[in-house]
Amino acid sequence: MNRKKIIVAAVIVALLATLAYGWHYYRQQNDASLTLYGNVDIRTVNLGFRVAGRLASLAVDEGDDIHPGQTLGKLDDGPYLNALKQAQANVQSAQAQLALLKAGYREEEIAQVRSEVAQRQAAFDYADNFLKRQQGLWASKAVSANELENARTARNQAQANLQAAKDKLAQFLSGNRPQEIAQAEANLAQTEAELAQAQLNLQDTILLAPSAGTVLTRAVEPGTILSASNTVFTVSLTDPVWVRAYVSERHLGQAIPGSEVEVFTDGRPDKPYHGKIGFVSPTAEFTPKTVETPDLRTDLVYRLRIIITDADESLRQGMPVTVRFPQR
């Protein structure tokens, strides 16, 4: 009986020991800080002018640091200044034309047209009376058929001129048609749009830095004739600084957006940078060869983007880093 109790006790002790070891191992695996490997993300942008022209000057060179809004270069703006002046003149002309149509006709202009109607009425009366005389003479064979036809043609032309003058007077008395005013308004809107485009083109003769960075390459020199979008500078963006790292599926649950991490470099192994996870890729991929990791290259991993919150000039793009998550 005692022997049986001893065996049962031994089994219980062994079972408890196994459970204790398993729990200890589980806690070790979950409490240990997660270590990942990656690189400072390389982000570059090609800068160029949106408009074509002759390069007048460049303000920075390779290796220079730049800040947002800094002037990097200028094109010869002469052609664009001329285009702007022409666009401004077109707008002024369209504004004057619209104002003239809206104001209608002046009394002096109406009086002038009335006088024109009276003159053409007199001319028609004379031509009509002359035709009647010629018709009487034709009946008595005193004029030729050609003379009669010339008189009829002159009377018809005088009648057409009189009708044109009367139509013009009617238009002057009723004012401009709404369609004419609408057309003038549309013409003004078009010239204003052309003016806005001319102003934008002139602004684009100055190349401004879009964000902070470092000039990597200077592709052209002053005097070069550039087409729109030709690369002038290649710039490495330095703000914000991102780290690209990779996490296995087994540890994916620890890589939560917003989680704080520490980032170590070989240059300062005892003084980490601090960052937060900003993005976790929804799709898996094989570990890139550029990442220094002890994991198998055939393992599927998920890409992380870590935003460094206290970056300095020592953190260079492409630099290998070690990312550590704090113990839970």
From Swiss-Prot:
HAMAP family: UPF0194
Pfam families with a match to the protein in the record: HlyD_D23 (PF16576)
Annotated source species: Yersinia pseudotuberculosis serotype O:1b (strain IP 31758)
Keyword Heme recorded: no
Record bears the keyword rRNA-binding: no
Taxonomic lineage from the root: Bacteria, Pseudomonadati, Pseudomonadota, Gammaproteobacteria, Enterobacterales
Sequence similarity: Belongs to the UPF0194 family.
Keywords of the record: Coiled coil, Periplasm, Signal
Name assigned to this protein: UPF0194 membrane protein YpsIP31758_2812
PANTHER family, per database record: EFFLUX SYSTEM COMPONENT YKNX-RELATED, UPF0194 MEMBRANE PROTEIN YBHG
Chief site of localization: periplasm
Position of the signal peptide: 1-22
Coiled-coil annotated residue ranges, if any: 80-109, 141-209
GO cellular component labels: periplasmic space
Domain of life: Bacteria
InterPro entries associated with the record: CusB_D23, UPF0194_membrane_YbhG, UPF0194_transport
Subcellular location: Periplasm
